[in-house]
Curated annotation (Swiss-Prot):
It comes from the Eukaryota. Keywords: Acetylation, Cytoplasm, Mitochondrion, NAD, Nucleus, Oxidoreductase, Transit peptide. Pathway: Amine and polyamine biosynthesis; betaine biosynthesis via choline pathway; betaine from betaine aldehyde: step 1/1. The keyword Cytoplasm applies. The modification N6-succinyllysine is found at K94, K537. Multifunctional enzyme mediating important protective effects. Metabolizes betaine aldehyde to betaine, an important cellular osmolyte and methyl donor. Protects cells from oxidative stress by metabolizing a number of lipid peroxidation-derived aldehydes. Involved in lysine catabolism. This is Alpha-aminoadipic semialdehyde dehydrogenase. It is found in: Cytoplasm, Cytosol; Nucleus; Mitochondrion. It comes from Bos taurus (Bovine). The gene is ALDH7A1. GO terms for molecular function: aldehyde dehydrogenase (NAD+) activity; betaine-aldehyde dehydrogenase (NAD+) activity; identical protein binding; L-aminoadipate-semialdehyde dehydrogenase activity. Its EC number is 1.2.1.31, 1.2.1.3, 1.2.1.8. It catalyses: nonanal + NAD(+) + H2O = nonanoate + NADH + 2 H(+); (S)-2-amino-6-oxohexanoate + NAD(+) + H2O = L-2-aminoadipate + NADH + 2 H(+); betaine aldehyde + NAD(+) + H2O = glycine betaine + NADH + 2 H(+); an aldehyde + NAD(+) + H2O = a carboxylate + NADH + 2 H(+). Residues 1-26 form a transit peptide.
Length: 539
């Protein structure tokens, strides 16, 4: 049993059938994990010691070979050969050619193909979820849940494929019809982040496909194996339907590939998920060519608990929102505003709840908290904790790196900072929760909105008037506005995205499909006359 500094309660959890030697020192691990017997299941996904990272109907790759690592022990899993610029050019051309075939397939038939993709993902849900846990570092239930989210989006997209379209509008001219025609944009570039390497691609891919688009995916380099495994599943479905594999192309790579996608006029829409800093650069490059971008960037999300809040909801909600995925969700709660009358009680309850968090091997079924994704993330965590102290904050729980292999840090609670402290207004992708006291509604609504990001927000109250003020024009300015639930855990039926420096894009449900299509207003004259609009006479 390894020891953890501080107050964290560590428990031995049951191992899943996929469990490996997560805590063995690196000196004992002389080979890639994929070559060790306990990780033989990786080959069920078609993975090998070295994997091609380019797919455009056939597999290849002439770029740099990178190694991906397990965040739970920092040991190498397998290698991926990334795309060269020549690979990128070839893939874009093949994707454009594939689009010309896919666009002619009726939308309900496209939905049938997406349904088959969902079914194929269902068949691999446990093993693919285990890969997400292994390469990203999130706990197994979240890894499997992420694959389930892609499956759910496929189900949603199947129904949507029979519903997309525009209205017939009343024309002011006799013998005329006025309609909206929606067509696919063409090629959709999808750049995803490490934290949701399956689900975010699924949000974009399933909806873009039923709209009639081809897709070009560049995942995060640190989760390249996941990108390869998912693409292999999709490629088999396309092959079985005698469709070009380049409809769902893949170019694993780094900033050079991402920059090429942003600047490429052949990429009709670029969906980018990542940091606000990089997202701004992407937006400028796309805008320079008058292209379309769909941005899902940072979040500095807040939970507000009023004096009438049900604390039996507040405490577990704050715990899950702040600690889930080790604080690496876009919707992670980073700020907790507590009415002054309940502040001390909630903080004490939270500290007790944090002490019960089960930390360990992400594959163990009872574990709730895994590692950060990289060593760099650990450094960022430590830097943020030190900065919070310098700015007047008090670490009342956590704040340290855990004494064990891997990228484990203690989930952390900080009190005593000003609501507008510099570190509070800086998104740190780590499990740090800043807690504040407030006096009244106007004050705390303003504090919620004063940060540059506008992704997710939540209040806890029983006051119906306050709830509707929160939802109204002077309430939360976020894209996700919740009541009596956490900031994280969005459902696929709603449009996902945020305002301000979060980017303004919307993915997944509701009418987010419109971002993957272009709209034409069409006037059809079926009469023998030629009346002009607005009653103009031109004779």
């Amino acid at each position: 049993m390894w020891r953890v500094p501080g107050l964290l309660c560590v428990r031995v959890a049951r191992k899943s059938k996929f469990s490996g030697s997560w805590n063995r020192p690196a000196a004992f691990m002389s080979t890639l994990l994929i070559n060790q017997p306990q990780y033989a299941w990786l080959k069920e996904l078609g993975l090998r010691e070295e994997n091609d990272g380019v797919y455009n109907g056939s597999w290849g790759g002439r770029g740099e070979v990178i190694t991906t690592y397990c965040p739970a022990n920092n040991e190498p899993i397998a290698r991926v050969r990334q795309a060269s610029m020549a690979d990128y050019e070839e893939t874009v051309e093949k994707a454009r050619e594939a689009w010309s075939i896919w666009a002619d397939v009726p939308a309900p038939k496209r939905g049938e193909v997406v349904r088959q993709i969902g079914d194929a993902l269902r068949e691999k849900i446990q093993v693919l979820g285990s890969l997400v846990s292994l390469e990203m570092g999130k706990i197994l239930v979240e890894g499997v849940g992420e694959v389930q989210e892609y499956v759910d989006v496929c189900d949603y997209a199947v129904g949507l494929s029979r519903m997309i379209g525009g209205p017939i509008l009343p024309s002011e001219r006799p013998g005329h019809a006025l309609i909206e025609q929606w067509n696919p944009v063409g090629l959709v570039g999808i750049i995803t982040a490490f934290n949701f390497p399956v689900a975010v691609y699924g949000w974009n891919n399933a909806i873009a496909m039923i709209c009639g688009n081809a897709c070009l995916w560049k995942g995060a380099p640190t989760t390249s194996l996941i990108s390869v495994a998912v693409t292999k599943i999709i490629a088999k479905v396309l092959e079985d339907n005698k469709l070009p594999g380049a409809i769902c192309s893949l170019t694993c790579g780094g900033a050079d590939i991402g920059t090429a996608m942003a600047k490429d006029e052949r990429v009709d829409l670029l969906s980018f998920t990542g940091s606000t800093q990089v997202g701004k650069q992407v937006a400028l490059m796309v805008q320079e060519r008058f292209g379309r971008s769909l941005l899902e960037l940072g979040g500095n999300n807040a939970i507000i608990a009023f004096e009438d809040a049900d604390l039996s909801l507040v405490v577990p909600s704050a715990l899950f929102a702040a600690v889930g995925t080790a604080g690496q969700r876009c919707t992670t709660a980073r700020r907790l505003f507590l009415h002054e009358s309940i502040h001390d009680e909630v903080v004490n309850r939270l500290k007790k709840a944090y002490a019960q968090i089960r930390v360990g091997n992400p594959w163990d079924s009872n574990v709730l908290y895994g590692p950060l994704h990289t060593k760099q993330a650990v450094s960022m965590f430590l830097g943020a904790v030190e900065e919070a102290k310098k700015e007047g904050g008090t670490v009342v729980y956590g704040g340290k790196v855990m004494d064990r292999p891997g990228n484990y840090v203690e989930p952390t609670i900080v009190t005593g900072l000003d609501h507008d402290a510099s570190i509070v207004h800086t998104e740190t992708f780590a499990p740090i929760l800043y807690v504040f006291k407030f006096k009244n509604e106007d004050e705390v609504f303003a504090w919620n909105n004063e940060v540059k990001q506008g992704l997710s927000s939540s209040i806890f109250t029983k006051d119906m008037g306050r709830i509707f003020r929160w939802l109204g024009p002077k309430g939360s300015d976020c894209g996700i506005v919740n009541v009596n639930i956490p900031t994280s855990g969005a459902e696929i039926g709603g449009a996902f995205g945020g305002e301000k420096h979060t980017g303004g894009g919307r993915e997944s449900g509701s009418d987010a499909w419109k971002q993957y299509m272009r709209r034409s207003t069409c006037t059809i004259n079926y009469s023998k006359d030629l009346p002009l609009a607005q009653g103009i006479k031109f004779q």
